[in-house]
Each structure stands twice: as C-alpha cells, then as structure tokens.
Amino acid sequence: SFAKNKILRKVDLFLYPAKCILLSGKNGSGKTTLLKIVAGLEKPAEAEIEYSGKSLSWKKAIRNILKEIIYLHQQPLLFSGSVESNVAYGLRFTSLNRKQRRESVIKALEWSGLTDLANIQANTLSGGVQQRVAFTRAWILKPKVLLLDEPMSNMDHESREQARLLLCRMKSAGMSIVITSHVPQYFDGLTDVQFNLSNGQLAESEFSASNDSL
C-alpha cells in the first residue's frame, strides 16, 4: 500500500507479467504520483513491497527491483541526435559490445517500423513518432515493467494506433505495462484491468489474476 502527502491512501497495486493495467482519474487525482512511486522516483510515507512472494524493504526494492522498471514521461525525453542514437543510448550501460549493440538497435528499429527514420534528428519528428522512439528505446532494454504517463495525449488517431500496436507487442512478449490516461478508449484491446483513482483510492473493475504477480 502507498501513501503520499494524503494524495494516496492505502492503495494496493499488483503487477502481473504480460498484463496491462490502466489507471484513470481526473487531473490531480494522483495517477502520476502513483507511477513515480512504483518507479522509485518518489518515496512514499509508507510502503509494503512484495516481489516473487518475498517482502522487501524500500531500500532493497530500489537496489534490486527498480532496475527492471522503466518510466516514460508524458513528453518523450529525446536528445538532439538521430533516432538511431536515441534508441541506442541505454545500451551504453549494458555489458553488450559495440557489435552486439549495433545488432540490437537494427532489430529494434525494424520491430518498431522506424528503420527509414534511423538517421533523422529525433527531436524534429512529430510527437507521435517521438513517442514511438521512446517506446523503442525502452523496449531494447527489455524491462519487466513499463510505466507510461499519458502516453497518447498528444497523438492523432493514426499515431495512437501505431503506438498501441507496439504496446500490444510488448505485452505479448511478457512485459507488464501500467498506463495512466484520462481517455481509456485509447487503449481498447490492450487493457486487462482498469482502476479509477479518486479521493486517493483505487476502484477496481473485474480482473481474473490467473498469472503469478511479480
């Protein structure tokens, strides 16, 4: 459960492999705060964390679990380099050698349909394409959990469909995805369970948790 300056009160959130959770609610309801707590970017006043059946302290969770979680802001945080260099950035901190990194980037660009844009300056592209670049940069690192804060708020219909397809592929590969949005319809066909955050608490819709939680 989480609590943060009375924005969130006794919130329980369970993450499952290959499942997508949608968090809806009004602006200021605490959706982003909850995501940042899960990502380890904000520390709650109180928290109970269980991972693979074991209880962990906040310090151990930060050290052992959160490296498997990627949080993406509403606005894609891309630097002034090519699409390819943006996608490759995170691999610099892995054990892969230069050849392996190059091969991984080529496969990731093919996976996301961005091969033809590989040499284009990423920050000159439309918001929808920039978000796909951000998704690809996350995907190449193979996190267990992907946290997305209003990922489709600045996209047209075509861009949303392209982004939703990438998210479906991530989920099919076993990734756990948590999304905040005030427009749940954007994620039809992707979401497994939806929560509405109101007055600091989550109201859960029906969900059959057939898989083991993380």
For every predicted segment, state its role.
Residues 76-85:
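Conserved catalytic motifs of ABC-family nucleotide-binding domains
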Residues 121-125, 129:
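Conserved ABC ATPase signature
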Residues 47-58, 65:
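Conserved ABC transporter NBD signature motif
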Residues 135:
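Hydrophobic anchor residue at the start of the ABC signature
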Residues 39:
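Helix-to-loop junction immediately C-terminal to a conserved catalytic motif
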Residues 99-117:
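Conserved ABC ATPase "signature" region
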Residues 146-149:
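Catalytic Walker B motif of ABC-type/P-loop ATPase nucleotide-binding domains
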